[in-house]
Amino acid sequence: AATSSAAQLTMAGGLLQRYAQRAGGLYMQTHVAENRDEVRWIAELFPDSRSYLDVYDRCGLLTRRSILAHGIWLDDTDRERMAQTDSSIAFSPSSNLFLGSGLFDWAKAEAAGVGVAPASDVGGGTSLCQLRTLADGYKVLALQGQRMTAWQGLYAATRGAARALDL
């Protein structure tokens, strides 16, 4: 959102909605609520929006083929809206640990019905390996008193990722 105007985002949302039914529809992938400074900056750029996610929602950019990276600083209302639109989170633990962005709350996302799939975040991560990404995800959850079983990790990296991609 930071690199686009409201008009540009609305135009992108219009295209996304317009072609949603053709050949399976378009995908939309972007970042959301990765770190606190970014969230504050988006609030300054889009003062009429309730939250960072709301910027995308108002522009028609949340669909079942919308994949939003990070989502660390989403609130309950944001997670509820993501579930309503069937949008997914690309959980990027390696990047988030490396950059000190914060800890993604998988339990809250899951409880809200938001799909989560692990992602390497090649631009900010330390590895493209999904197994290393899952290992970092395990650590992120453990730091919050949450648990990722081997089955949850396997599901997230396979079927969960396919769900996020609407396959």
Please state what every model-predicted region is.
Residues E34, P93-L97, D121-G124:
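Short, acidic/turn-prone active-site loops that include or flank metal/cofactor-
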Residues F98-L103, S127-C129:
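Short, charged, surface-exposed secondary-structure boundary motifs
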Residues R58-R65, A107-L167:
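His/Asp/Glu-enriched, well-ordered alpha-helical/loop segment
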Residues A1-S88, G100-V116:
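Histidine/acidic residue-rich metal-binding segments in metalloenzymes
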